[in-house]
Regions:
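Short amphipathic helical patch at the helix-1/turn junction of helix-turn-helix
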Residues: 12, 22-24, 52
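N-terminal flexible/basic segments that precede or flank functional cores
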Residues: 1-16, 63, 75-78
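Recognition helix of helix-turn-helix/homeodomain-like DNA-binding domains
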Residues: 37-53
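Short basic helix-loop element that most often maps to the first helix and adjoining turn
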Residues: 16-34, 60
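DNA major-groove recognition helix of helix-turn-helix/homeodomain DNA-binding modules
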Residues: 56-72
Length: 78
């Protein structure tokens, strides 16, 4: 399994990751919004750190671009 990125509690890192994935897959914000069922504003707001999306909301654009979100336990946390 190839890991494309990691969503964390850091709103800036999450926004940058979503933007990078979108650019790597050659989607415009509008195209991604339409394909994922989000508004163009919602995609923009995540990418520019205005919103911290719930996991379900973050998964929608990722899935639309062909990515899955995998949940993995952090080392040392049991």
């Amino acid at each position: 399994m190839d890991v494309a990125g990691k969503f964390t509690g850091d709103i800036r890192q999450n926004g940058e990751l979503l933007r990078q994935l979108r650019e790597d897959t050659f989607f415009t914000r509008l195209q991604l919004a339409k394909k994922s069922g989000l508004t163009n504003f919602a995609v923009w707001a995540i990418e520019v750190f205005r919103r911290h999306p719930k996991l379900v909301t973050a998964a929608r654009p990722c899935y639309a671009m062909g990515y899955d979100i995998v949940v993995v336990r952090r080392p040392g946390e049991e």
